[in-house]
């Protein structure tokens, strides 16, 4: 990629491991967090907010290996002069978070004809939780992987 002029690649590996840390800090139980993530093959759809829980959960081993892999990826990107674009909080929340906050009007998405239990909830950006979770996500990411300039 670097040889072809790509200098700002996405670096989304291990974003679920970082999100898990954030949700634990927000008071969710591990089993509720694990029920939120899809299996590895479906993570692109999970990250886009299309699908939750399908073919999951992710194991502790998976999360640890993703953290190791992301360190290697980021080191190499930086060696090649690339500026990684890291993930940020996009507003998708576990069902357990939505259930804990009935005072918030979450948007409940539907996608691909999947049963309601697999659909995502979106936290409205005007709520104080959006900023709090977003800040926690970046703090956790930078604590693990170091300072970053660009987030998506």
What are these regions (language model features)?
Residues 2-152:
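Aromatic-lined carbohydrate-binding surfaces of glycoside hydrolases
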